[in-house]
Structures are given as structure tokens and as C-alpha cells.
Amino acid sequence: MWIGVISLFPEMFRAITEHGVTGRAVKSGLLQIECWNPRDFTHDKHRTVDDRPYGGGPGMLMMVQPLRDAIHAAKQAAGDGAKVIYLSPQGRKLTQAGVTELATNQKLILVAGRYEGIDERVIQTEVDEEWSIGDYVLSGGELPAMTLIDAVSRLVPGVLGDQASAEQDSFTDGLLDHPHYTRPELLDGLAVPEALTSGNHEVIRRWRLKQSLGRTWQRRPELINNLALTDEQESLLAEYVREVRDSVK
């Protein structure tokens, strides 16, 4: 997968190109990340990339020309088929379903804004989609861009050593992940659930599904309400709810 990034701080992306899962993906050639800095497309000695907004108000906006030229350079490097995404709190909220959708693209260009944002005409003429990672304000689009890259790259075949890791992550099936345990089997009086040490794969599968359903019901009930549960899921969730209510009587 190829990802181009437009950012005034391209050095920030070393965090994902040199470390962790994404760093290994870059080193193995499964993921390619290239950055373009709008400052490299300025024509004045101060390398100016911001200007005052029309109509007044606080803050500055990223200038059209350097930003647009940087996007054009990224498009030229990408070739045909690259989707341009602007990271913005006004965009579509990123969910696992959205990550899966974005992962179907072989080429993405991510535009990380700064200051008070970018000129609306750049969005109208250069951007295909706007995406947000949440209803809060950050200093720039770099962290959202890195979040998107990390999430999407996990779905690229071969990036994870075990593809089941991606398939079992929280939200992949609309549910939160189940609890996980490793050695020792007994820690400060707390034991690993018997189901996980039973060696029975079906018992383990049902326990994990039940815990996933229950945890989602307790922590993110709106996710449960949006799902069409199978008969097995409904039965396991009812069992979980009953056990919780019995425990507080």
C-alpha cells in the first residue's frame, strides 16, 4: 500500500515509519509512506505557508498555492487512482468499518492541516473525502493521519504476523474485544478463567464471544443496539447479563 502525506512537520511521521508494526511494514516493503512539505513549494525567502482569513477572526489559514502544489506533487508521484483525504474534525468519524473501507484503496494521500485549517476551495477542488478521528480539536492533522495509517496498515495482507490478530481486534465485528490473559495462571489471588485453560476450543470460543458481548453491553451499549445478533449471541449475552445482575443481588 502506498500513502502520501502532506504535512508541515513530516519528521513527525518517523514515529510510524521507523517503529512498531508500521515500521516493520515499511522495512518489508508492504507499506510505502512518502511526505511532502508545503514549505518546499513556497516562492518567498521566508517560506510562508499561512495567511490571514478573509472576514477577520483569530488565527491563520494555510495558503492555497503551497498546499495545492504539494498535493499535485503527491498525486503525480502516486499516479492514477490515489484518493485524497483531508483530516478534519468536520469529516466522517473514523470507525473500524471506515478503516476497512479505506484499506481497499491501494493509494491514499493524507492532507494534515495546521493553524485554523485550510482554504475551502482546496477542499472543493483537491480533496475526495474528509475524515475525523473524534469530536475534539488537535493542533494539527498529523496525529489523526498517523492514527489512520496505523489502523489501515493493520489490514494490509502480511503486515501482521498473524492475520487473526486483526480479525479479532475490537470493533472488527462491531463488538469490543474480550479480556486477555497470559502467564502466570494465578496472580495476586486472581486466576485465569477456567474456560481458557480447559484446552477445549469450543468452550474457549464461546467464552470469548460471551465476554466480548458482555463487555460491549456494559461499556458501549449503543454498539449492541446497532447489531443484528445471532441466536447464539443473544443467548450468550442474556447469560452474561443474568450473571452480572445475580452478582449484585
Curated annotation (Swiss-Prot):
Enzyme Commission number(s) from the entry: 2.1.1.228
Molecular function via GO: tRNA (guanine(37)-N1)-methyltransferase activity
Gene3D superfamilies linked: 3.40.1280.10, tRNA(m1g37)methyltransferase, domain 2 (1.10.1270.20)
Catalytic activities: guanosine(37) in tRNA + S-adenosyl-L-methionine = N(1)-methylguanosine(37) in tRNA + S-adenosyl-L-homocysteine + H(+)
Sequence positions that bind S-adenosyl-L-methionine: 113, 133-138
InterPro entries, alphabetized: Alpha/beta_knot_MTases, tRNA_m1G_MeTrfase_C_sf, tRNA_m1G_MeTrfase_TrmD, tRNA_m1G_MTases_N, tRNA_MeTrfase_TRMD/TRM10
Function text: Specifically methylates guanosine-37 in various tRNAs.
Name of the protein: tRNA (guanine-N(1)-)-methyltransferase
Gene: trmD
